[in-house]
Amino acid sequence: MAKEELIEMQGSVTEVLPDSRFRVTLDNGHQLIAYTGGKMRKHHIRILAGDKVSLEMSPYDLTKGRITFRHLPGRGPGPSSSGSR
């Protein structure tokens, strides 16, 4: 599946489930089960109930998603792509 087909949404984690899965409520009220993406798992990014997250969903199965970013309070809306390093 190409990346252009993915749907990106925002939501908040309502429940932490076993096996690195989370129940997420989207901003439009829809609930789904999401898992952490590979880089988040690799770098041990912790996600707790109440965290605001960005996630990707397939248009073919809107009940599952992959968490791609955890928004920190007091930061901007998403990952910055400024190459100032």
Swiss-Prot record:
InterPro entries: NA-bd_OB-fold, RNA-binding_domain_S1_IF1, TIF_IF1
Main location: cytoplasm
Gene behind this protein: infA2
Residues in S1-like domain copies: 1-72
Gene Ontology cellular component annotations, sorted alphabetically: cytosol
Keywords, in A-Z order: Cytoplasm, Initiation factor, Protein biosynthesis, RNA-binding, rRNA-binding
NCBIfam families on file: infA
Subunit composition and interactions: Component of the 30S ribosomal translation pre-initiation complex which assembles on the 30S ribosome in the order IF-2 and IF-3, IF-1 and N-formylmethionyl-tRNA(fMet); mRNA recruitment can occur at any time during PIC assembly.
Protein name, entry field: Translation initiation factor IF-1 2
Source organism, top-level taxon: Bacteria
